[in-house]
Amino acid sequence: MAALTNDTAYFHALTRLWDNLVSKKLYITGGMGSRAQGEGFGPNYELQNHTAYCETCAAIANVYWNYRMFLATGDSKYVDVLERALYNGVISGVSLSGDKFFYDNPLESMGEHERQRWFGCACCPGNVTRFMASVPSYAYATQQNDIYVNLYIQGKAEMQTADNKVTLEQTTEYPWNGKVTIKVTPEKEGKFAIRLRIPGWTKAAPVASDLYAYTDAAKKYTLKVNGSATRGAEGDGYETIVRTWKAGDVIELEMPMDVRRIKANDKVEVDRGMVALERGPIMFCLEGKDQPDSIVFNKFIPNDTPIVASYDANLLNGVMVLKGTAKEVEKDGTVKDVAFKAIPYSTWNNRGADQMEVWIPESKEYATPTPEPTIASKAQTFTIQAAIQKDAPESAAVMSYAWGVNDQWEPKRSSDTSKPYFYWWLKNGTVESLAYEFDKPYTVSKVEVYWLDFDHYDGDFRVPQSWTLYYNC
C-alpha cells in the first residue's frame, strides 16, 4: 500500500518496524517471534533459543516482507535478511524428505522437538509448498535499464529492461561455494547496468544493525568481466557494472567462504559467552548424533579453535560440515579435548529427535555438564487440564505431558523463560494439578517448586494463591 499510494507515513512506519526487528528481535537464523503465546514478540532483545517460537510461516513472511521492502527501495540490506531467512529459518521448517514439518523452529533442543506430518492448525505445510515454487522470483529484479542480481542460484532467466531483452545464465554451487559465473546474452548489443548484490555475510555484520557482529575481518571478493579484473560503482550493497553488453560476455564473482564466528549484542542475555558458526549464508549447529558422546550442552569452542569446512556427499543428501576440536566439561568439572562436527541448521532433526544448539559456549563457565539423574528427573510428569470453555463437563478434561518441570535446567529467576517451562494457558483463578509418576517407590525428603512469573498480553502467570502436595504411599 505504501508503494502503490506513495504514502510516506506508511513507509516510515514500515521502516521503524523493520529497524526494530533487525536491531532487536531478529534471530540469527532469520527467524522471528520469540514467544509461543500469541505467536509473537517479547521485549527488545528477548531472543530465547530453547523456547524460541520462530514459526515457519513467520520466516516465510520475513522473506515476503523484505522482498517488498527491497522493491520499494532498491536497498540490498533487505535481501540480506531475505537470504538469511530463506537458507536457514524457512527450509529448517521442512524435512529433507519433504513430508514432515516444524511449526516452530527453536535454536536449541534437548531432543523434544520433531517434525510432524500434519498439525491441527496446518498453516505451515501449505505455506512451505507454495513458497518453494516462488523462490526463483526473488533472484532478479529490473528497473528501467538496471538489472538487479539478488540471489546466486544456478539457472537461466530472461528479463525485459526498458530497451532490451536480456538472458542471464548463472553457473554456481552457491551456497556451498562462493564462485558465481554469469553469462550475459542481450537480445541486441546495448548499454545497461547489472547490479550484483554483495551479501552481508561478506562484510562486518550479518545484518544492517549492531544486533550481531563477526569476530573477524572479511576477505575481499573479486570481480571479473571477460577474464579481466574490474570494479563497479558501490552503493546500497550492490556493485554496479555499467557497460555496453554483448552476447557472450561473462561476469565472474568470487566471494571467499571462510568459517566465521558471530557474537550477539551483549543486551541479548541468553547469548552472552556464546558464539554462532556461519559459512556463507548458512548457519550451523551442533547435533547430538554427530558428537562422540551424543551430547552438545557440555561442550565449548574457544575463540582460537581452528575449524575446517568440508563437503560430505553421504550426509543429509550432501552438505558442508564444520569440524574441529572442542572442549568437553565432565561431571567432576574436568575438561578434555573432543572432536566436534557441525551441520547446517536447516538439516537438523532429519535423523530422529536429538539434542541441538546453534549458540555454542566459548568458555567453560557457559557449558553445562550432564547432571546425574535424580528422583524427579526419572519420573513421568503429566497434568490433567480441564477444558478452557466454561461449564464444560469433566469428561472434556485432557491428561497430557507436563514439559519443563523435571528436565534439570535450573532457572535463573522466576521470569527466566530461556529454557522449557510449564504453564496453564488461559487459566486464572482455577484449580489445576500436575503429577509425577515414579517407576518404583522412593523416599522423598523435600519438595520445592520454582514458580513462573511471566507477563503476556493474553494473560499473566503468577505465583498461585496456594498449593498443596498430595502423595500415594
Give residue spans per PLM region.
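Aromatic, loop-rich ligand-recognition surfaces of beta-strand-rich domains
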Residues: 372, 415-473
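Short amphipathic, basic-aromatic surface patches that mediate peripheral association
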Residues: 198-212, 450-458
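Alpha-helical scaffold segments in carbohydrate-active enzymes
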Residues: 4, 13-27, 84-92
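Structural helix-adjacent loops and short alpha-helical linkers that scaffold large soluble proteins
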Residues: 2-15, 22, 70-80, 186-188
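Well-ordered alpha-helical segments within folded domains of soluble proteins
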Residues: 1-3, 12, 51-70, 125-135, ...
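C-terminal beta-rich recognition modules with glycine/proline-rich loops and embedded aromatic residues
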Residues: 14, 80-88, 93-185, 203-225, ...
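Carbohydrate-binding/catalytic loop surfaces
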Residues: 31-55, 98-122, 420
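Short beta-strand elements bearing conserved aromatic residues within extracellular beta-rich modules
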Residues: 194, 221-223, 467-469
